Amino acid sequence: SETAAPTTESTTAPDPKPVLSGDAALKDGETYTGRAPLPLVDFNVSDPENTRGLSTEKHGYGYGIAKDGKPNDISVNNQKYFETNGYKALCLDTKSTDKVLYLTFDCGYENGYTAKILDTLKEKQVTAAFFCTLPQVKENPEIIARMINEDHIVGNHSVTHPSFPTLTRLQMANEIKGMDDYLRTYFGYSAPFFRFPMGEYSDSALDAVGSLGYTSVFWSVAYSDWDLKKQKGEEFAFNTVMSRL
């Protein structure tokens, strides 16, 4: 975030030259969005040596399948755990009295569908959150710029997509900062939302990410569109998702 406290620890700087997939290279001070570049910020991760002994045990995120319009108890208990322990993390909106759906997408690579998704969202006048890795951003700057200019959230999904529980807290900060630096420099953009690669987290990781000013965003409904063996057509996909809302 813009208000992150300074630190003397080494952090990852953005690449001096972006990887381009469009027209001529950007000139100094230009961005893909047409916005002014944002100043870089230093990230100060709290308790870098984890002297408090927060658990580093790896958890694979589970959410359970909702039924009859009610979220699964697993998702409910996940959110209670986050709130009880003071973690800046969301998997379920427990505040709203309305029936609200938040659309989120993980973008670790491009497979030709993102532009179509953006077309549909624009047609339906819906905004969403796209959690992107640095390679996705560098290789598809026009798509990322479109997300930003059409008022979607481009969330931080790390530089190299590692399992965060296997990293030190300083390494976690560098993964997040490297992505944020690039967005600030070449897109004039930053957003304080993070998604753990592969949904793998630990108590220490939740705490570290929160100390950087980021909210960790999980989910309570999902469809395995990444598994090609499970695809049975758009009607099946639609009915599966709708039955879990």
Pin down the residues of each PLM region.
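N-terminal pre-catalytic segment of deacetylase/amide-hydrolase enzymes
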Residues: E2-T104, E110-K116, E123
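Metal-dependent polysaccharide deacetylase catalytic core of the NodB/CE4 family, i.e.
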Residues: K99-L101, N111-Y113, I117-L118, K122-A237, ...
